[in-house]
């Protein structure tokens, strides 16, 4: 009988049953492709993450992460599952993390190898940090009314003083709503939205507002993902760089800030938040700082 340690982690939160959930599977190198897919289907979460040795030499990587959806399909990268995996590894004292301190790892994914940092000064509540990919915001090729029609919403849900924009690195679309009230009332027609998503290869529709439930935060957002079969994601780490870039580009926050708080998930009953560190330079860049909480650990047994 083969056994695999598994850990259920809620990422982008420090409270159980909030943020975005993932299951982390350790020692996955002896699992077949079919077994990984079946495990992900059984866990029935948006993504399950598998920890393996790096698949190649020549480029330095400490370990590899693979991400499979509830349908058993593999995706190149998943932010909340990455946070969950690093949190679980820190809690289990893997890869030399046996003492309080600072640790950095080169993490191989199908989207590339990334430097990820774990602040384990307090091992009970490690802080996970990593640089977000290059951000390339451009004005979208349609106006507010066209977007509203394509999403099946009233145009008044959009702040028409702010442009609709697309972040080309990840193919995420961003638009602004006037207030938290309008953001909370937003109901996207998933069928219509999927048609636009397929046509323009848009992975995420991000609705944001420069208002927040927590006074320490500067922005609240919602994430609609019909292209990948997710009506709404509780918390989407990959779109946070675009959120920060949009806010700074249009001076919707104090542009002297070195860190902004971003929240998501409250309208789904799974509130979460991250800190986005703004890295000063000729090109906008930022770094994500996230917490997580582990719900349980178990052993998965397979013949």
Please state what every model-predicted region is:
Residues 1-77, 83-303:
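Active-site proximal loop and beta-alpha junction motif in alpha/beta enzyme cores
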